[in-house]
C-alpha cells in the first residue's frame, strides 16, 4: 500500500515536470532581446536539454530525463541548480557551432533535500550528446562534490552517459580523473551513492565503483569497461549488453551493484527510502525516527525458530525481521553471496547495520564472495558511526580447491579485519553454530565485540561433532556415544560462557529488548586507537 502511494505521488509530480518542460519549449525566442530576456531564454533552453525530439526518444526507451529524475528524487521545490549556463569549450569537429552549444551541457547539478535533509546531486542528461562527459561536464560534477565535502552532505549521482566525449580527447579523460580523485577524497567522509539509469562504459565505470553504493535499473542500465563489439573483436565472444553488464549480471554474478529496481520511478522512490538510513557525514549521526515499536517487545516465536536438528535450515531473515523496528529491513546485495545477509534497519528508531549468516544457503558457510560482501558493508558502517548487530550461524569457511585457489585466506581475512577494525557499538547474537575460525571472524568477543549473546541452541566449538569425533575418538567402537559426549562437553554455549567469551545466554524472545538496551548504553562509546597514516587491509 505504501509503495503504491509513493508511485502515485511520484506520477503526479512527474506530470507537473512534463508540463513545465513543454512550456519551456514553446517559450524559446529567436528575436533580438534584452539581457534579461536572453537570460530567461538561456534558462528555458537549459530546461529543455537536447530538445523535445530527444526527450521523446528518452521516454520511448522507458527512461525519464535528467530533470525529471531530480524532481522525483528530491523534495518538491527544494532543488537549487548550479552552473545552468556552463557550456562546453570544444572548438574542434564543428563543436563551436551554435547548434552544438547547450546551456548546462550534458549534466544537471545542484543541491536539494530528501525528507528535509541536505543532499548534492548530479544527473547526466542523455538528450545532450548522449550524456557524454566533457571538460565542462566534469567541472560541474567536481564543483558540487567539493561543496558537499565542505558542508558535510552526501552526493548522489544519476548516471546515464555514453562515456567520454571523443571530440574533446584527453580533456575528457582528465575530467574522469578529477572526479575519481574526489570520490577517493570523499570516501568515509560523506556517503556517496550511484544510481545507474542508462549506459555507463569505459572509464566512467570507476566513479560508481568508488562510491559506497551502486544501484541499477533493470533492462535500461549497463555497466562495462568494454562493450560487446570490442569483446567480440578481442575474444570472439558473442555477448549482449544485458549479459555483459546488465543489472542481473552485476547484482547476482559480479557483485558490482548492490540492488536493481524495476524502472526509474521505482529506483528513485527506493533511493529516497534508503537515504533515510544514512547520516549526512561522518560527523553527523544518522537520523533517529519516532518509533512506535516498543523497545522492550518480546518475540515469542523466536523461542522455536531454530530447528532442533543442527543440520536443518531456517531463514535468518525471519529473525532479523522479528527483531528490528516495524519488521522493516533494507537489504543490501540480496541476490549476491546469499550465504551472508547485510542491510540496514532501525532499533528503537536508530539506524543499525545488520550482518547475518544465512543457513538456507551453503549452510551459512563463509566463502570468498560473502567475506568481501560482509567486509565492505562493515567498513561502511564503521566509517559513518552506524552500530553493528551480527547474527551468527556459521559452520566454518567453505572448503574446496576453488576457494583455496581463489584466495579464501586473503579474502576471509578482509571480514576479520573489518570487524576487528570497527569501533562502533557491536552486538553479536549466536543463534546456533559458531565453529572454528569463522566463530572468531563473526564479530566475536575476541575482536572487541561489546556485547556477545548466545541462544540456548548455540554450538560454539572448534568444529562439528562428527568431524571432531573422527579426530579425538579415532577407532572408537561406539561413534554415537562419542558424538554425544563431545556435544555434551563442547557443542553448546556453556564452554564459551564460563570463559566469558559470551556475556550471557539469553532466551531468543528477549533478543530485541536486550539489543535495544545495549545500544542505549553503547551510544556514548569511544575508542582510541594508535595513530597511523592508514591501515593495510589485505586487499
Swiss-Prot record:
GO terms for molecular function: ATP binding; propionyl-CoA carboxylase activity. Residues 294-533 form the CoA carboxyltransferase C-terminal domain. Residues 32-533 are annotated as: Carboxyltransferase. Residues 325-358 are annotated as: Acyl-CoA binding. The keyword Phosphoprotein applies. The modification N6-succinyllysine is found at residues 99, 474, 489. Its main location: mitochondrion. Keywords: Acetylation, ATP-binding, Ligase, Mitochondrion, Nucleotide-binding, Phosphoprotein, Transit peptide. The modification Phosphoserine is found at residue 71. The keyword Plastid does not apply. Residues 1-28 form a transit peptide. It comes from the Eukaryota. This is one of the 2 subunits of the biotin-dependent propionyl-CoA carboxylase (PCC), a mitochondrial enzyme involved in the catabolism of odd chain fatty acids, branched-chain amino acids isoleucine, threonine, methionine, and valine and other metabolites. Propionyl-CoA carboxylase catalyzes the carboxylation of propionyl-CoA/propanoyl-CoA to D-methylmalonyl-CoA/(S)-methylmalonyl-CoA. Belongs to the AccD/PCCB family. This is Propionyl-CoA carboxylase beta chain, mitochondrial. It comes from Bos taurus. The gene is PCCB.
Amino acid at each position: 500500500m505504501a509503495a503504491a502511494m509513493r508511485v502515485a505521488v511520484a506520477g503526479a509530480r512527474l506530470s507537473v515536470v512534463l508540463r513545465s518542460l513543454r512550456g519551456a519549449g514553446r517559450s524559446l525566442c529567436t528575436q533580438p532581446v534584452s539581457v534579461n530576456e536572453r537570460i530567461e531564454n538561456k534558462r528555458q533552453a537549459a530546461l529543455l536539454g537536447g530538445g523535445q525530439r530527444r526527450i521523446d526518444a528518452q521516454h520511448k526507451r522507458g527512461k525519464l530525463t535528467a530533470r525529471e529524475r531530480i524532481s522525483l528524487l528530491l523534495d518538491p521545490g527544494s532543488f537549487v541548480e548550479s552552473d545552468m549556463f556552463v557550456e562546453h569549450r570544444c572548438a574542434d569537429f564543428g563543436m563551436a557551432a551554435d547548434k552544438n552549444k547547450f546551456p548546462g551541457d550534458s549534466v544537471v547539478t545542484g543541491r536539494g533535500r530528501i525528507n528535509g535533509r541536505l543532499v548534492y546531486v548530479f544527473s547526466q542528461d542523455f538528450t545532450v550528446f548522449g550524456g557524454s562527459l566533457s571538460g565542462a561536464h566534469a567541472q560541474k560534477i567536481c564543483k558540487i562534490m567539493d561543496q558537499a565535502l565542505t558542508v558535510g552532505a552526501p552526493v548522489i549521482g544519476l548516471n546515464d552517459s555514453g562515456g567520454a566525449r571523443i571530440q574533446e580527447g584527453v580533456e575528457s579523460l582528465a575530467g574522469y580523473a578529477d572526479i575519481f580523485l574526489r570520490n577517493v577524497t570523499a570516501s568515509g567522509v560523506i556517503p556517496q551513492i550511484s544510481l545507474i539509469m542508462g549506459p555507463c562504459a569505459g572509464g566512467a565505470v570507476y566513479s560508481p565503483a568508488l562510491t559506497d553504493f551502486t544501484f541499477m535499473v533493470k533492462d535500461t542500465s549497463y555497466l562495462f569497461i568494454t562493450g560487446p563489439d570490442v569483446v567480440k573483436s578481442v575474444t570472439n565472444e558473442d555477448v549482449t549488453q544485458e549479459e555483459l553488464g546488465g543489472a542481473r549480471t552485476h547484482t547476482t554474478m559480479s557483485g558490482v551493484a548492490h540492488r536493481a529496481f524495476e524502472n526509474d520511478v521505482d529506483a528513485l522512490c527506493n533511493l529516497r527510502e534508503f537515504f533515510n538510513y544514512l547520516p549526512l557525514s561522518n560527523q553527523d549521526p544518522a537520523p533517529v525516527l519516532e518509533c512506535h515499536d516498543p523497545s522492550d517487545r518480546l518475540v515469542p516465536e523466536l523461542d522455536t525458530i531454530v530447528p532442533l536438528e543442527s543440520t536443518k535450515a531456517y531463514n535468518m531473515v525471519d529473525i532479523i525481521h522479528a527483531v528490528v523496528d516495524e519488521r522493516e529491513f533494507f537489504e543490501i546485495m540480496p541476490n549476491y553471496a546469499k550465504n551472508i545477509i547485510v542491510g540496514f534497519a532501525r532499533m528503537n528508531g536508530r539506524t543499525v547495520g545488520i550482518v547475518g549468516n544465512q543457513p538456507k544457503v551453503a549452510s551459512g558457510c563463509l566463502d570468498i564472495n560473502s567475506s568481501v560482501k560482509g567486509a565492505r558493508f562493515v567498513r561502511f558502517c564503521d566509517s559513518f558511526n552506524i552500530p553493528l548487530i551480527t547474527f551468527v550461524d556459521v559452520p566454518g569457511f567453505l572448503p574446496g580447491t576453488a576457494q583455496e585457489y581463489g584466495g579464501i585466506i586473503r579474502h576471509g581475512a578482509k571480514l576479520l579485519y573489518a570487524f576487528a577494525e570497527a569501533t562502533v557499538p557491536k552486538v553479536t547474537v549466536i543463534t546456533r553454530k559458531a565453529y572454528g575460525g569463522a566463530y572468531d571472524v563473526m564479530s566475536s568477543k575476541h575482536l572487541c565485540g561489546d556485547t556477545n549473546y548466545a541462544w540456548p541452541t548455540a554450538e560454539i566449538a572448534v568444529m562439528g561433532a562428527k568431524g571432531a569425533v573422527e579426530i579425538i575418538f579415532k577407532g572408537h567402537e561406539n561413534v554415537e556415544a562419542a558424538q554425544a559426549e563431545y556435544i555434551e562437553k563442547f557443542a553448546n554455549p556453556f564452554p564459551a560462557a564460563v570463559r566469558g567469551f559470551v556475556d550471557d545466554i539469553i532466551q531468543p524472545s528477549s533478543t530485541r529488548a536486550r539489543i535495544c538496551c545495549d545500544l542505549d548504553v553503547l551510544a556514548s562509546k569511544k575508542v582510541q586507537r594508535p595513530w597511523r597514516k592508514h591501515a593495510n587491509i589485505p586487499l
